[in-house]
UniProtKB/Swiss-Prot annotation:
EC number: 4.3.3.6, 3.5.1.2
Active site: 78, 170, 172
Physiological role: Catalyzes the hydrolysis of glutamine to glutamate and ammonia as part of the biosynthesis of pyridoxal 5'-phosphate. The resulting ammonia molecule is channeled to the active site of PdxS.
UniProt protein name: Pyridoxal 5'-phosphate synthase subunit PdxT
Length: 195
């Protein structure tokens, strides 16, 4: 079973590396045809406005809308989380897919030079996880159907809603593959047990 990584812009190569290390068949998704070959999709960090525009231009956004109705698994990191959100408070006119019942604030954890790493307690992945935050979005509201898997302070930074997963941080930039494994298990994709 193939997992796609949206390759329109952003750090998609790092996600490919993580999936390949887990011995999962992967494809870079740049077209609707690419997307149709997958059993799940990762939307990487990058520039959410650019990724959103390109997803609409290529038809990928429309195709994702159909797939989400069929419980298609999607994981969004950083910019990917912004695109999954139903609303972006500090950029109300920015396009998002709106699949998750979360409201986010872009760049809420600071600018690029204010990036940081922190250990998060994530029981569903086996405890402490070193999370890397780079111009990260903050979840400021979330619906009842959204499960909070990890928090930084009082704010959720890893959430799940059905077959949708989103994180403010970048697990693809570290060596710990447990978040990717969690997503693969959500998607029903077998992987190597490497951490």
């Amino acid at each position: 079973m193939t997992i796609g990584v949206l390759g329109l812009q952003g750090d998609f190569r790092e996600h490919l590396w993580a999936l390949q290390k887990l011995q999962v068949e992967t494809i870079v998704v740049k077209t609707v045809e690419d997307l149709r070959k997958t059993k799940g999709l990762i939307i990487p960090g990058g520039e959410s406005t650019t990724i959103g525009k390109l997803a609409r231009l290529t038809g990928i956004a429309d195709e994702l809308e159909k797939l989400v109705d069929q419980d298609f698994p999607i994981y969004g990191t950083c910019a990917g989380m912004i695109l999954l959100a139903k609303q972006i408070v500090n950029y109300p006119y920015q396009y998002s897919f709106g699949f998750m019942d979360i409201v986010v604030e872009r760049n809420a954890y600071g600018r690029q030079v204010e990036s940081f790493e922190v250990n998060l307690d994530i029981p569903s992945t086996g405890g402490l996880f070193k999370a890397i935050f780079i111009r990260a979005p903050k979840i400021v509201e979330w619906g009842e159907g959204v499960e909070v898997l990890a928090r930084y302070g009082d704010s959720p930074v890893l959430v799940r809603q059905g077959n949708l997963l989103a994180s403010s941080f970048h697990p693809e930039l570290g060596q710990d593959l447990r978040i990717h494994k969690y997503f693969l298990e959500m998607a029903g994709v077998k992987h190597a047990g490497i951490c």
